[in-house]
Swiss-Prot record:
This is Superkiller complex protein 2. Its EC number is 3.6.4.13. Residues 319-475 form the Helicase ATP-binding domain. Residues 220-246 are annotated as: Disordered. The modification Phosphoserine is found at residues 245, 256. The gene is SKIC2. It is linked to Trichohepatoenteric syndrome 2: A syndrome characterized by intrauterine growth retardation, severe diarrhea in infancy requiring total parenteral nutrition, facial dysmorphism, immunodeficiency, and hair abnormalities, mostly trichorrhexis nodosa. Hepatic involvement contributes to the poor prognosis of affected patients. ATP binds at residues 332-339. GO terms for biological process: nuclear-transcribed mRNA catabolic process, 3'-5' exonucleolytic nonsense-mediated decay; rescue of stalled ribosome.
Length: 1246
């Protein structure tokens, strides 16, 4: 075709091409161009150079011509070695611990060795990262003290643990396995496997052995010699024996390998039986502290420790139980000598060559106890957040948080632990840190005995019972009855030298309350106020006076105490600012002698010499030195730690005569005073002002009275304004102290630490908490009741539900649901404001309780008690009111028909109508009618009360009573199915959706009940009773199962919500396995989610160490405030980024259902000390930091110390995640923070 043909031309001759030579500037180079009209020359110096394209250059160098790279040199090129085939390497196994050992068999009498036998060793394959057993090998020496977040904790005491011993000592039934058909052909997790189907092969010769025959006579369980001999006895020729075995003794094949494993597990894995409980499961054993111990030295001829004094009775009883290795709970008054019990436990551990841990709630108390115990025992160590002294000692002193960390991290110190001493146990009531005590008590292993030291608490037996059930051991409770030094309580109303004698006894040393003293104080105050009003006019009294009034009050009080030789005195003031003001206002007061001044001066110089020069010139140091020289001291959280220790030591020496302190001084070592003064009986608890609780008052007042020096202690309450009410004083001074209450709450650290251990569950931790104790202490009774109900249910006869009774189960369930729905609606009505308003005098109601069944009544009077409202109601009844429960109304409706369920079917008297007056609770009223009667409630009640007396019993009722009864009877006869009632939605204006939906559901159920067919059967009553009995038993069984299950836990919904938060953020997977982020969070001491997110978001790695420290101060600072505008832009951006991450976490928490709002979560961050920490990390002296913030020096020090602990946690977390750069920065940040006065060594450790 012509369209497809192409013209083929010959190639052009190169000589015919129009080539032109172009000179390239002045370079001497030429270029041939095949372009018509090309120029004869270019620029004078050629084209300007241009940057080559990087991508083209890289491709040219590395891809197009890579030969120039030294990588491709022959000497560096990759070589391949031929693998040598070694089939025998498949038989090699890795080195493993020897699972057996040789044990000598000796003659029982002579001890002569008769032979050796091989015994299996236990726990040879355990490690700290796979087992919770105490028999696992110790971890690395570097981790023996603190443990490691990747290690497992030791098994908590009191929990059921299936041990290896149980598996080895059981009588294992010999199970024979068919090695031809019972083996798996598809490995777990694979879709395909090996095909072992029989093939067409010639039948093997009779003399060949099968695998089953070869393995049958092997003694895999290590049987005795007789069995081995029996197996090996020749029964004939060798060939005959072997060939006859498979035929004469065929293998008994199991139906399934899974069944076999389950059968073995059911017979083998059995939780160990709990120790035999005491009678009636009495775990808390009260000990009579007044019963003398006459044979003390006969029972303990060589005590582990002796004192220079004779121990008290309660101390001897506690020591006797310690010798028996019992756990004790000593609840004694302040300064009664609880430390004696701790000292004996420490001495006993040293005698046994074991270890003791002494825990305290605060670090300052740990330092003080370290000094005291070191002076007594010598071999004592101290572990706090920033100090580690003698960790190898037999007695270690630490805070409870550190012990919790050691327990979770599997520290090997726990192995040698014999005693754990919990001091100040009443601190468990602390909202923030009380949960730590419960965690530690739950996680302690079984071999550790517990010593609890506490002030007197009313529920010591209950708390001990919880610990006893928790650990399955008896706890002996020893309480003191009286104080060693009785107290006298006074009211002081003076305010000048003329009135310094106005001291009125209110509560004497025998505990008698003197109303005379109270009224005398009131009269003295009134008289002075009237004179003041006559001179200066009336003035409203106040609780707190001004500085001038305070100065007059304290000068007059201290003058009176000094005259009576009642110094030293501790003045408890519930404000840091008022402490400083009151001490500073006493400029004219000097209470020390010249020799005491010299001693104070030398002590101050010696203690302050360890500080740098500028730190010794701090305003607080100079001011405190001046106060101490005059015998005054101040002690609160705003004081520098070294100054607080100086004040404490001088006070213990008697050189501080007057100490103004907050209530934290009442917690700690025994530092009693002659007198204790309360500046006020009201305090601010963080949310509101309130009176002191009895426990708080007793704890602080207990510092009065020095044992062995004072016959009585003096407690004085200042009345600067009006005298407090007598009832308030009586409740505060003589009321019962606060009970020990659970503050258990879920934290992400707790959840992650338990989730990483398969054998421990968070639900078990919640079950064993003190908050669940009231509902869990009857678990054994619930189990017994459940077993009895199960047996009873099995003995019941099945109801016949054939024919017309086929819908009997539905009818029963409809009736039950209708009743529950009606009760719910009525409960909502009674809880509403409009519902309670409608229940006024004269309202007609339907009464339904144990005595009355749907009887009409009229409300006569409405009153309120401490819990709910009480309605005094006149109710219709038979005449006379039957006292036999079998004759009452409800019995007639034992088998409910539709008319009984739908509507009320009001009670009508069978004979003459009578009435009674009863007190009803809101739940006793089944309905509120629309009818209101005009009644005179007072007259009716008065007449009814009169007729209850024997001599007026036959008097006729008043006309008001008769009229009310006739109105009720007429209303019941007119509406036998129930009078009109108030509609909860239309009449009472209830907008609750549950009420609206409940009303709709109730009407639907009424229609279903009226259409039921079972009620028409003559067998309905008998079969209904059978079904109801069965359903009631099943319902009770479901209730008991619920109480015994995890679903009844109070914190279970929150636990699921927090796990969902962790799953959303990627800390755990769908199966609950802890991922890398979760393991990093376990290493954090606080703010675990926020710190982990900041680390994984790379928000810290790009910052300098001082900037990281400044940002993290927002997580530990307790002083609210803004960061200010003088910060570098890097810090401002960092603060915004931290808040953004916190907001994201808060939003996830809200999305998962937690109650904490995003604003509350972000509001926990306080960046008020960012600039202070930033400048401190950059090297600014502490003396120059005061101008950057108005925060007290003590709080600044506290913030920096906690910040250094957080930096160490982040350093360990960075190493765990593989971030050496961040770890190095955190190490640098901690080093920058740890300097000068902030980290000055405690005086107690020198």
């Amino acid at each position: 075709m012509m369209e497809t043909e192409r013209l083929v031309l010959p190639p052009p001759d190169p000589l015919d091409l129009p080539l032109r030579a172009v000179e390239l500037g002045c370079t001497g180079h030429w270029e041939l161009l095949n372009l018509p009209g090309a120029p004869e020359s270019s620029l004078p110096h050629g084209l300007p150079p241009c940057a080559p394209d990087l991508q083209q250059e890289a491709e040219q160098l590395f891809l197009s011509s890579p030969a120039w790279l030294p990588l491709h040199g022959v000497e560096h090129s990759a070589r391949k070695w031929q693998r040598k085939t070694d089939p025998w390497s498949l038989l090699a196994v890795l080195g493993a611990p020897v699972p057996s050992d040789l044990q000598a068999q000796r003659h029982p009498t002579t001890g002569q060795i008769l032979g050796y036998k091989e015994v299996l060793l236990e726990n040879t394959n355990l490690s700290a990262t796979t087992s919770l057993s105490l028999r696992r090998p110790p971890g690395p020496a570097s981790q023996s003290l603190w443990g490691n977040p990747t290690q497992y904790p030791f098994w908590p005491g009191g929990m059921d643990e299936p041990t290896i011993t149980d598996l080895n000592t059981r009588e294992e039934a010999e199970e024979e396995i068919d090695f031809e058909k019972d083996l798996l052909t598809i490995p777990p997790g694979f879709k395909k496997g090996m095909d072992f189907a029989p093939k067409d092969c010639p039948t093997p010769a009779p003399g060949l052995l099968s695998l089953s025959c070869m393995l049958e006579p092997l003694d895999l369980g290590g049987g005795d010699e007789d069995e081995n001999e029996a197996v090996g006895q020749p029964g004939g020729p060798r060939g005959d024996t072997v060939s006859a075995s498979p035929c004469s003794a065929p293998l008994a094949r199991a139906s399934s390998l899974e069944d076999l494993v389950l059968k073995e597990a059911s017979t083998a894995v059995s939780t160990p039986e709990a120790p035999e409980p005491p009678s009636q499961e009495q775990w808390a054993i009260p000990v009579d502290a007044t019963s003398p111990v006459g044979d003390f030295y006969r029972l303990i001829p060589q005590p582990a420790f002796q004192w220079a004094f004779e121990p008290d009775v309660f101390q001897k009883q506690a020591i006797l139980h310690l010798e028996r290795h019992d756990s004790v709970f000593v609840a004694a008054h302040t300064s009664a000598g609880k430390t004696v019990v701790a000292e004996y436990a420490i001495a006993l551990a040293q005698k046994h060559m074991t270890r003791t841990i002494y825990t305290s709630p605060i670090k300052a108390l740990s330092n003080q106890k370290f000094r005291d115990f070191r002076n007594t025992f010598g071999d004592v160590g101290l572990l706090t957040g920033d100090v580690q002294l003698h960790p190898e000692a037999s007695c270690l002193i630490m805070t409870t948080e550190i012990l919790r960390s050691m327990l979770y991290s599997g520290s090997d110190v726990i192995r040698d632990l014999e005693w754990v001493i919990f001091d100040e146990v009443h601190y468990i009531n602390d909202v923030e840190r009380g949960v730590v005590w419960e965690e530690v008590l739950i996680m302690l292993p079984d071999h550790v005995s517990i010593i609890l030291l506490s002030a007197t608490v009313p529920n010591a037996l209950e708390f001990a019972d919880w610990i006893g059930r928790l650990k399955r051991r008896q706890i002996y409770v020893i309480s003191t009855v009286t104080r060693p030094v009785p107290l006298e309580h006074y009211l002081f109303t003076g305010n000048s030298s003329k009135t310094q004698g106005e001291l009125f006894l209110l509560l004497d040393s025998r505990g008698a309350f003197h109303t005379k003293g109270y009224y005398a104080a009131v009269e003295a105050k009134k008289e002075r106020m009237s004179k003041h009003a006559q001179t200066f006019g009336a003035k409203q009294p106040t609780h707190q006076g001004g500085p001038a009034q305070d100065r007059g009050v304290y000068l007059s009080l201290l003058a009176s105490l000094r005259t009576r030789a009642q110094l030293p005195v501790v003045v408890f003031t519930f404000s840091r600012g008022r402490c400083d003001e009151q001490a500073s206002g006493l400029t004219s007061l000097d209470l020390t002698t010249s020799s005491e001044k010299s001693e104070i001066h030398l002590f101050l110089q010696r203690c302050l010499a360890r500080l740098r020069g500028s730190d010794r010139q701090l305003p607080q140091v100079l001011h405190m030195s001046e106060l101490l020289n005059r015998g005054l001291g101040v002690h609160h959280s705003g004081i520098l730690p070294i100054l607080k220790e100086i004040v404490e030591m001088l006070f213990s020496r008697g050189l501080v005569k007057v100490l103004f302190a907050t209530e934290t001084f009442a917690m700690g070592v025994n530092m009693p005073a002659r007198t204790v003064v309360f500046d006020s009986m009201r305090k601010h608890d963080g949310s509101t002002f309130r009176d002191l609780l009895p426990g708080e008052y007793v704890q602080m007042a207990g510092r009065a009275g020095r044992r062995g020096l004072d016959p009585t202690g003096t407690v004085i309450l200042l009345c600067k304004g009006r005298v407090p009410e007598m009832a308030d004083l009586h409740r505060m001074m003589m009321g019962k102290p606060s009970q020990l209450q659970s503050q258990f709450r879920l934290t992400y650290t707790m959840i992650l630490n338990l989730l990483r251990v398969d054998a421990l569950r968070v639900e078990d931790m919640m079950k064993r908490s003190f908050s669940e104790f009231p509902s869990r202490k009857d678990s054994k009774a619930h189990e017994q009741a459940l077993a009895e109900l199960t047996k009873r249910l099995g003995a019941l006869e099945e109801p016949d539900m054939t024919g017309q009774l086929v819908d009997l189960p539905e009818y029963y369930s409809w009736g039950e649901e209708l009743t529950e729905t009606q009760h719910m609606i009525q409960r909502r009505i009674m809880e509403s404001v409009n519902g309670l308003k409608s229940l006024s005098a004269g309202r007609v109601v339907v009464v339904k309780n144990q005595e009355h069944h749907n009887a009409l009544g009229v409300i006569l009077q409405v009153s309120s008690n401490s819990t709910s409202r009480v309605f005094t109601t006149l109710v219709l009844c038979d005449k006379p009111l039957s006292q036999d429960p079998q004759d009452r109304g409800p019995a007639t409706a034992e088998v409910p028909y539709p008319d009984d369920l739908v509507g009320f079917k009001l009670f009508l008297p069978e004979g003459p109508c009578d009435h009674t007056v009863v007190k009803l609770q809101p739940g006793d009223m089944a309905a509120i009618t629309t009818k209101v009667l005009r009644v005179n409630g007072e007259k009716i009640l008065e007449d009814f009360s009169k007729r209850q007396q024997p001599k007026f019993k036959k008097d006729p009722p008043l006309a008001a009573v008769t009229t009310a009864v006739q109105e009720l009877l007429r209303l019941a006869q007119a509406h036998p199915a129930g009078p009109p009632t108030l509609d909860p939605v239309n009449d009472l204006q209830l907008k609750d959706m549950s009420v609206v939906e409940g009303g709709l559901r109730a009407r639907k159920l009424e229609e279903l009940i009226q259409g039921a067919q079972c009620v028409h059967s003559p067998r309905f009553p008998a079969q209904y009773l059978k079904l109801r009995e069965r359903m009631q038993i099943q319902k009770e069984m479901e209730r008991l199962r619920f109480l015994l299950s995890d679903q009844s836990l109070l914190l279970l919904p929150e636990y699921h919500q927090r796990v969902e938060v962790l799953r959303t953020l990627g800390y755990v997977d769908e199966a609950g396995t802890v991922k890398l982020a979760g393991r990093v969070a376990c290493a954090m001491s606080s703010h675990e989610l926020l710190l982990t997110e900041l680390m994984f978001d790379n928000a810290l790695s790009t910052l300098r160490p001082e900037e990281i420290a400044a940002l993290l101060s927002g997580l530990v600072c307790q002083s609210p405030g803004d960061a200010g505008d003088q910060l570098p832009n890097t810090l401002k951006q960092g603060i915004e980024r931290v808040r953004a991450v916190a907001k994201r976490i808060g939003e996830v928490q809200v999305a998962c259902g937690l109650n904490q709002t995003v604003e509350e979560f972000v509001g926990e961050l306080n960046f008020g000390l960012v600039e202070v920490v930033y400048e401190w990390a950059r090297g600014m002296p502490f003396s120059e930091l005061a101008g950057l913030s108005g925060t007290p020096e003590g709080l600044v020090v506290r913030c920096i110390q906690r910040l250094a602990e957080m930096c160490r946690s982040l350093r360990g977390a960075a190493r765990l995640v593989g971030e050496p750069v961040l770890g190095a920065k955190m190490e640098t940040a901690a080093t920058l923070l740890r300097r000068d006065i902030v980290f000055a060594a405690s005086l107690y450790t020198q």
